Structures are given as structure tokens and as C-alpha cells.
Regions:
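Karyopherin-beta/Importin-beta family HEAT-repeat alpha-solenoid scaffold
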Residues: 1-244
Length: 244
């Protein structure tokens, strides 16, 4: 049975210069992929601030977690390898983890969110959008950034979907667009490098949401104009970060 201590040790050994030790750790992690609570242990090591580990180990845990989710969330025969309890634990805490994670970990958690949303959203993940919206309204820049990043990962699920499959995207736009427009207006009023990065990420959400067609809300000229006009008035930062 996998424990968080054992998982921590295996991950640490995968970073070892000793090839034999690395291979043994990789094999142990592979054998434990779908063991009860293993994905939760990986999640905690990656994102739980009460677990004292360095960034390299958090990143390794997040990458391993992404692999486990891609292999075990929904198998080819329709039977998931991961337990319902473990999946619920990940879903219930993923957005919160993303808003507090360091960037290299947040990126991997975002890919986890995207993989899960492709299977579970919206029916089995009703709390996802409310969690994103709640964090978009916070005064903390990191929380807002994490929420926007989570939103982009969700929207990308529907980026190239047929119109008949885009109803969840339309619902997400209806709920988040007013918050996003309000956020960009606020960022313009108090320009900064961090604010420009948030505005850029908001535009990436918009880009992903409008690849195939405009969601119904954005067919209204006054709604579409809000973000576009705001972006035209956003000052270019002296430093920009590379966003996925």
C-alpha cells in the first residue's frame, strides 16, 4: 500500500544520480499508480503547503500525478482505475491548489485539470466553475492568476469542439465574462507589469473561447467590445512572462 512517506521517498530517488536507485524508484511508482490514495499522495506532495518539500520535488510529483490521471481517470473499457474517493479528493481541491502553487507546478496541475474536465465536466464536477469564479473575485493577484489559468484550461477543452458540444463552454462564458471584463477594467485603472500579465491571460481565455464560433453572450456587440476596447487601452509591460 502506498503511503505519502513512501511516495515522497520514491520521488526523491527518481532525482538521484544513481541509475539503479532511479530505476527502482520509477518501478515502485509505476506499480503503485492506481493503489488507493496514491494519486492523492502525489497531489499533496505537489501542492499541499503543509508538506515541506522543495520545488523540484513538487514539480516531479505534479508531473507524475498528470501521468497517473491520464492513464487511470477513465480507461478504454469505461472503468476507471482510480477510485471514486481519490478522484473526488483531486477534483475538490484542484482549483485551490492551482491558485497557491508556484508556476512550474501550476502548469502541470492545469494539465491535470484539462484532462479531468474532458471526462467529468460538467456533470461530475459541478464545483469547478464556482471555485474559479470565487477566486477571480479575490484581491490577491496570485489567486486571480491561478483562477484565470484554471479557466483557460477548462475553455481549451472546448476550443475545437463542434457547436453541438459547446454548451458547457457557453455556460462558462456567461458566468465568467462579466468578471473578466471587470477585472481588465480594474487593471487598466492601476497599470502594472503583474496587471498586464493578468490581462494577457484573460485574452488567451478569450482566444480559446472563440476559436470555432462566438459564444451567444459575445454575439452582443456591447459585450464583445468590453474586453477588446479594454485591451487596446492596456499599457504594454516592460517585462512579459511566457504563458502556456
Amino acid at each position: 500500500m502506498s503511503t505519502i512517506e513512501a511516495t515522497h521517498g520514491w520521488l526523491q530517488s527518481t532525482l538521484s544520480a544513481d541509475q539503479t536507485q532511479r530505476r527502482a524508484a520509477e518501478e515502485a511508482l509505476k506499480q503503485s499508480e492506481f493503489a488507493a490514495e496514491h494519486v492523492v499522495h502525489l497531489f499533496r506532495i505537489a501542492a499541499d503547503t503543509s508538506v515541506a518539500v522543495d520545488v523540484a520535488l513538487r514539480q516531479a510529483a505534479a508531473i507524475r500525478m498528470k501521468t497517473v490521471i491520464s492513464r487511470g481517470w477513465d480507461s478504454a473499457d469505461g472503468k476507471a482505475a482510480l477510485s471514486a474517493a481519490d478522484k473526488a479528493a483531486v477534483r475538490d481541491n484542484l482549483v485551490e491548489a492551482m491558485v497557491v502553487a508556484v508556476p512550474v507546478v501550476r502548469t502541470q496541475l492545469g494539465l491535470c485539470l484539462r484532462s479531468i474536465a474532458q471526462i467529468d465536466y460538467p456533470g461530475n464536477w459541478p464545483g469547478l466553475l464556482p471555485a474559479i469564479c470565487a477566486n477571480m473575485q479575490q484581491q490577491n493577484t496570485e489567486r486571480v492568476y491561478g483562477a484565470l489559468f484554471a479557466l483557460r484550461m477548462l475553455v481549451k477543452v472546448y476550443e475545437f469542439r463542434k457547436e453541438a458540444e459547446r454548451a458547457p463552454l457557453h455556460a462558462a462564458v456567461e458566468q465568467t465574462w462579466p468578471l473578466m471584463a471587470q477585472l481588465v477594467e480594474m487593471l487598466i485603472a492601476t497599470p502594472s507589469v503583474e496587471g498586464a500579465e493578468l490581462a494577457l491571460l484573460a485574452m488567451k481565455v478569450f482566444w480559446s473561447a472563440t476559436q470555432i464560433s462566438l459564444p451567444p453572450l459575445l454575439l452582443r456587440p456591447e459585450q464583445l467590445a468590453v474586453l477588446l476596447l479594454a485591451e487596446n487601452r492596456t499599457p504594454t509591460p516592460t517585462l512579459t512572462l511566457t504563458l502556456p
